Structures are given as C-alpha cells and as structure tokens.
Amino acid sequence: MDYNRMNSFLEYPLCNRGPSAYSAHSAPTSFPPSSAQAVDSYASEGRYGGGLSSPAFQQNSGYPAQQPPSTLGVPFPSSAPSGYAPAACSPSYGPSQYYPLGQSEGDGGYFHPSSYGAQLGGLSDGYGAGGAGPGPYPPQHPPYGNEQTASFAPAYADLLSEDKETPCPSEPNTPTARTFDWMKVKRNPPKTAKVSEPGLGSPSGLRTNFTTRQLTELEKEFHFNKYLSRARRVEIAATLELNETQVKIWFQNRRMKQKKREREEGRVPPAPPGCPKEAAGDASDQSTCTSPEASPSSVTS
C-alpha cells in the first residue's frame, strides 16, 4: 500500500480563510498556524451563548483556531443577515442590534472583532451615563418653581376679581302689595302648652297652637264673616287640617276679643234693655257646642 500517496491526499493546506473542505481522515498536525486572531468561532456567530465570547478562547495559544462553518463545503445557514455583524451583547445596551461590516473578511461573514469595535464605541454617547448625553431620551423637565407659578398669577387674579365683583344693584323699591284690614290685626305669639301626665288633668285644658298659615286664613274669614254656618265651618276645618270644634272656639274667642277692643275705644253702642249680651248668631253657636264633635271626613262623606 502506498502510504506516501495517501498522506499527500490528506495534507491539504487549511486556514481560516481558505475555501477548502475537511476530509474524514484529516490530522490536526497538518494545519498551519492561522494568521487571524484566535477567537471563539461559535461566540462570533451569535447563535451559542448570545454572542458572548469567552476570555479563555480569546487568548492566543499554540493551537490553530477552529475553522468557521463557512469554510466548510456544506452550506450552513447564518443567524445574522448578510452584510451585518452578529448581535453583540453588552450590559449597557438593549436588544440585539446588527452593525454593518467595514469590509468582508471571510466567505461567510467571519470577521475580526476589531472591525466593528470602533463603530460600537461611537454609540456610547447616546446610551451611557443614564441618558445624560445626546441620546434619544429627552432631558427631564425641572420641577415647578416660582418662575412657573408666576406665569399663572394673572389668570388667577382675573378669576378672583370676577368672584369679588359687587353684586347687582337692588331693584328700585316696588310698591308693596295691598294690605287688607284683616292683615293689620295684632296677634300675640302662641304660648307653648305644657302636656300633663296621663291621668292628671283633662285634655280640654290643652291649648291649640295654630300655625301662621292657619291664623292668616282664619283672620281672613273672620273679616268677611264673623259668624259661620255649620257647612262653612266644616269646610274651613278640612282646608286648614283642623277639626270643627277648634274652628268654632277660635271664632268665639275672636268675637270676644273684637268686642273688648271696641269697648276700650268707646265705640260700642249701649245695649238696649231686654237684649241678651250675645247676638242671635252667638246663640246658635252656643247651641251647637254641646253637639258631639264632627270630623271633616264624616261630614264631607
């Protein structure tokens, strides 16, 4: 067997940049030293370990560097697009970015790290120092101070001046409503009745406190009619939410008060002999005092 012929077949010169193919019986001792810097070929591809190169593989050694997959005869897909460097990872950068190569140094995009180191160094101004440089982030606005609040002072002063405007002048004195005679009657303020304990005293001793509305309506009715009929008395009691007895007693007291005032003023004519003190109308009221108390609902029904 011709061993020299077989050795000449196996000894093909292989280097990092030479387009050659490996053989199944290739010996590592036949490779010449590579002229390129020894780096980790898998880290440069960006497919293993996120593109991070190990310091142990970046040191020069006596062994030749491994050939990139692009130097093999078998087509191998690359993770980075053609003409761009693989993604480089750094603590001060965000997502993976591709940077164009200065020049093609290999058949499959295999390049020296120094070809894009200068390009990456120019981007440190926009991303370093927490956004202090001329980066894509706008500078922070200063907090509001006296300068900003002073610009709003005129607007606030105008609003305050509108609120403090003098109220509208009062309208000229309009003529008051017509005052009737029954509205000029002097009334004493109602006195609060003391409620007795149950079983002590009679309920008739309680005094009814009329409201202003009720007194006004009763005075108005007394001005026109000093004596009420039974039907009119029931109607007024239902309107003012009173009972018939309360309306009857109020009219009796009101007639007595009216006669007392007339006597004090000397306008009461002397009573003729043989005439009772009360008029015929009063007699009719006295006759109905003994009648049972009728409620408005029973009368109207």
Curated annotation (Swiss-Prot):
Compositionally biased spans, kind Polar residues: 26-38, 55-70, 284-301
Residue ranges of the motif Antp-type hexapeptide: 179-184
SMART domains, per the entry: HOX
GO biological process, one term: rhombomere 5 development
Keywords recorded for this protein, A-Z: Developmental protein, Disease variant, DNA-binding, Homeobox, Nucleus, Transcription, Transcription regulation
Gene Ontology CC terms: chromatin; nucleoplasm; nucleus
Subcellular location: Nucleus
DNA-binding region(s) in UniProt: 203-262
PROSITE patterns assigned: HOMEOBOX_1, HOMEOBOX_2
Stretches the record annotates as Disordered: 20-77, 127-149, 254-301
One Pfam family in the UniProt entry: Homeodomain
Record's signal peptide: none
Function statement: Sequence-specific transcription factor which is part of a developmental regulatory system that provides cells with specific positional identities on the anterior-posterior axis. Acts on the anterior body structures.
Family: Belongs to the Antp homeobox family. Labial subfamily.
Name of protein: Homeobox protein Hox-B1
Protein source organism: Homo sapiens
